Each structure stands twice: as structure tokens, then as C-alpha cells.
Regions:
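N-terminal "arm"/small-domain region of PLP-dependent enzymes with the aminotransferase-like
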Residues: 1-52
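Conserved PLP-enzyme active-site core in the AAT-like
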Residues: 2-10, 56, 75-207
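Short acidic/polar alpha-helix capping motifs at helix-coil junctions
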Residues: 22-26, 72, 142-144
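Conserved N-terminal alpha-helix of the aminotransferase class I/II PLP-enzyme fold
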Residues: 34-79
């Protein structure tokens, strides 16, 4: 696999070019990483309209992780969570009521920021009393998810998504296949914060 971004930045760092551009440290090493810290100079591509080395790197990552597409973000998973919810919200049922998201309670705070920014309600899926992992774990069973969806349906509300964190902060995994089947049966998208799961692709049976 090629490494187009690393190759470009290494060549630039070793070129001795006068840096008449941002950032202000001009590549002068203080912590050690500054020579590698550049902006959208010629050849460096542009993150949101990638056509060069970033596009090549994203294509490499797509093949590596076996995804349909891979896009790099400027703010890690928090930005990706907000983007995912924004896209899912576009398909929210137009009922005249505030959109509602069904979410496991161990969600990252980026979900709360998204709810404030995008103006939707959250209906929480709480951990079972016997779950010793408490909020850091919050496993969701097929039965609990089905019951929560049925309860919302009885109130005349259909969530625009079911939001889960898997793996969670303790390494626990949700049964994505089974929970996805429940969501499909109710016509509700399943949204997964998989920030801790990049390694899963490389395990037996990983995807």
C-alpha cells in the first residue's frame, strides 16, 4: 500500500523550502512534529475537495477497512458523529413533532452537542439494573430495543435513528447484526459510533 500523504510531507520537510504560509512556526522544530505540519499548499490537496494525495490516501483506507467510502475529518469522531446525525435527520418523518432519536445512554457528549445544534429530542436506552458496567457499558438487547421502538410507536413517534456505541469505552460489543435486524423491521436507520472499532476489520470474522 502506498502512503501518499506521508511521502509528500516528508519530501516537503526535507526540501528546505522557505515557508511563506501558515502555520506560524514555519516548520521550525520545537516539539519535533512542526516540519510535518503544513496547510493547503500546492500538491498537498484539500480535505473537503480531495483530488490528489488525500483522495489517494482515502482510497487506500477504503480498501483497507473494506468500506464503501472513507472520508477524513478535521475533528476526529466528534465531527463525524454530528455529520452522521445531520444526515440521518434529513430522513426524519415529517409529523409536525420534534424529531426523536433513540440512543443508548453511554453515548459520547458529541451526541448531546448534535441534539442542541440540530434541535432533536433524545429518548434514552438505559442499562439494565444488573449491568455492573453502568453507563460506560450499557448493552442493548433485542428485547429492550424492540420494546422501546414499540413504546414510541404507541405514542405516534418514529425515531429518525437508533444510536449505539460499539465497541464501548470498556471494549464491550453490541450485537449489531441482531439489533440491525430489529431496526430494519421498524424501518429505522441504525447509527453506530464505531470510533473504538477500527481494529475489528483485522480480526477473524471482522468487518
Amino acid at each position: 500500500m502506498t502512503t501518499p500523504i506521508v511521502d509528500f510531507v516528508r519530501r516537503y520537510a526535507q526540501s528546505g523550502t522557505a515557508r511563506l504560509h501558515m502555520p506560524g512556526h514555519k516548520g521550525q522544530s520545537l516539539l519535533g512534529c512542526e516540519p510535518w505540519d503544513i496547510t493547503e499548499i500546492r500538491g498537498a490537496d484539500e480535505l473537503y475537495e480531495a483530488e490528489g494525495i488525500i483522495a489517494q490516501s482515502e482510497a487506500n483506507a477504503t480498501r483497507l477497512f473494506g468500506t464503501a467510502h472513507t472520508y477524513y475529518s478535521t475533528e476526529g469522531s466528534s465531527q463525524c458523529i454530528r455529520a452522521m446525525l445531520c444526515l440521518a435527520l434529513q430522513g426524519a418523518p415529517r409529523t409536525g413533532k420534534r424529531p426523536v432519536l433513540l440512543a443508548a445512554r453511554n453515548a459520547h457528549k458529541a451526541l448531546l452537542y448534535a441534539a442542541a445544534l440540530l434541535d432533536f429530542d433524545i429518548r434514552w436506552l438505559w442499562p439494565a439494573p444488573e449491568d455492573t458496567g453502568a453507563l460506560c457499558s450499557c448493552p442493548v438487547t433485542v428485547q429492550a430495543l424492540s420494546a422501546a421502538l414499540e413504546e414510541l410507536a404507541g405514542q405516534g413517534r418514529t425515531p429518525f435513528g437508533v444510536y449505539l456505541t460499539s465497541p464501548d469505552y470498556l471494549g464491550g460489543m453490541q450485537d449489531i447484526a441482531a439489533l440491525s435486524a430489529v431496526c430494519d423491521a421498524h424501518g429505522v436507520p441504525l447509527l453506530v459510533d464505531n470510533a473504538h472499532g477500527a481494529y475489528l476489520r483485522f480480526l477473524p470474522g471482522g468487518s
